[in-house]
Amino acid sequence: MNQSLLAPFGTAIERVEAGLNALRQGQGVLVVDDEDRENEGDLIFAAETLTNAQMAMLIRECSGIVCLCLPDEKVKALELPAMVEHNSSQYGTAFTVSIEATVGVTTGVSAADRVTTIKAAIADNAKPSDLARPGHVYPLRAQPGGVLTRRGHTEGTIDLVQLAGLKPAGVLCEVTNPDGTMARLPEIIAFGALHNMPVLTIEDIVVYRKSLLAKVG
């Protein structure tokens, strides 16, 4: 990762703390993974604070494949099976079947409908029958252990919202350029500056979590 580009955002610890503060305030954060992995940046919001305007941004400025990151126990509680029996994707991205709220939506595609679906899924009393399958929101199952187990955006999202003291559910979408290509670090930093969003990396979250473990130890 080109640390010189990230230097204006502070140290790894400072970048994560800025991200946590943004999430607590209901704002978005940009998270970049390792250059030797997907080398992509995702725009992430806490699911519980997600607004229709923020969903519209995810649809308009990003790839449009809006994903809901959930911990393993929530996926099991909602009885969401894996999208495929044998996952052969390069990085083992753990998609479940797609979902739609059974109440309060029309076609399920609009920003408002997708937010309604997400709020239905993350409700404390949510039941499998609250969600139709398939739909227009794509849940992702996070590995237990977070980024210390798997260095993916799914795990990074759950780690961040939990570290921020929020409900363990987050929404992400890959940032794209206007021409449809994937945004890399320079474009992601420019996007963050334009929208006043902090930028951090999966590696930063690893460093932050290890520092917390060291303090406990």
Swiss-Prot record:
Oligomeric and partner information: Homodimer.
| Protein name from the UniProt record | 3,4-dihydroxy-2-butanone 4-phosphate synthase
GO annotations under biological process?
Answer: riboflavin biosynthetic process
Q: Which residues bind D-ribulose 5-phosphate?
A: 37-38, 42, 150-154, 174
Its UniProt pathway annotation is: Cofactor biosynthesis; riboflavin biosynthesis; 2-hydroxy-3-oxobutyl phosphate from D-ribulose 5-phosphate: step 1/1
Matches recorded under NCBIfam families: ribB
Annotated Mg(2+) 1 binding lies at 38
- Which SUPFAM superfamilies does this UniProt record tie to the protein? YrdC/RibB
Q: Which reaction does it catalyse?
A: D-ribulose 5-phosphate = (2S)-2-hydroxy-3-oxobutyl phosphate + formate + H(+)
Which GO terms label this protein's molecular function in UniProt?
3,4-dihydroxy-2-butanone-4-phosphate synthase activity; magnesium ion binding; manganese ion binding
Entry-linked InterPro entries: DHBP_synth_RibB-like_a/b_dom, DHBP_synthase_RibB
Q: Do the record's keywords include Cytoplasm?
A: no
Q: What Enzyme Commission number does this protein have?
A: 4.1.99.12
Which residues are annotated as site, described as Essential for catalytic activity?
Answer: 136, 174
| Binding residue positions for Mg(2+) 2 | 38, 153
Gene Ontology cellular-component terms for this entry are:
cytosol
